[in-house]
Design a protein with these regions (language model features):
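Amphipathic, alpha-helical segments enriched in basic
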Residues: 1, 19, 71, 75, ...
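Short, acidic/small-residue loops that bind anionic groups at enzyme active sites
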Residues: 107, 118-153
Length: 194
């Protein structure tokens, strides 16, 4: 069973987009999977009820696999990460990440403020032993199998050691989640301009 916490308040099109996307994912997943929407309960309930009544009525069967975790604060896309972490400790993003740290959820998804999510993850989830910096992973679709790109522009000043760490992270991901026995590793650099 997988329990995924979803930041229902994060992103430009929240709460509708994260709730609609999670409903579609839950409808396609086996019945042992569960979604926790994290955010303002009354807003989530209203949006969830509207979607299940109209556009996603065919997914009403998944309602019993959904729970809501109250989080009264929202980290805006314009908030500075450090200010958001200190001033919005009851935000949907921070509470969702803490759900993973405390073992209540297996994963966390947010379309919200990327810098705040990285900072909150560093504070509450920590780094795996041997890593000095996290990397954002993005799956790029291709005509064949998707390509995993790590550190999708998040860090402009990576050391050679950090690039090796990213390659190791990507290799583990490609083996474990993409089923690749011998994943290839490449380097794409933006370089530095004068």
């Amino acid at each position: 069973m997988a329990r995924i916490a979803v930041d229902a308040m994060g992103g430009d099109l929240a709460p509708r987009a994260p709730i609609a996307g999670a409903l579609q994912a839950l409808g396609a997943l086996p019945p042992q999977h569960h979604i926790e929407f994290v955010g303002q309960t009354s807003v989530i309930e209203a949006e969830l009820d509207a979607l299940l009544r109209d556009e996603f009525a065919s997914l009403a069967r998944v309602r019993d696999r959904i729970s809501i975790v109250e989080a009264p604060e929202i980290i805006a896309m314009t908030d500075k990460p450090s200010v958001a972490l200190r001033g919005k400790t009851n935000s949907s993003m921070v509470i969702g990440i803490k759900r993973v740290a405390d073992g209540h959820a297996h994963g966390f998804v947010s379309a919200g403020n990327t810098g705040a999510q990285m900072a909150a993850s560093l504070v509450h989830l920590k780094l795996h032993a041997g890593l000095t910096r996290p990397a954002i992973g993005t799956l790029f679709p291709t005509a064949g199998d998707p390509i995993l790109v790590l550190d999708s522009g998040a860090n402009m000043d990576c050391s050679p050691e950090e690039l090796v760490q990213f390659a190791r992270i990507g290799t583990v991901y490609a083996r474990a989640l993409l089923g690749r026995d011998n994943p290839a590793v490449g380097l794409l650099s933006v370089g530095e301009e004068a």
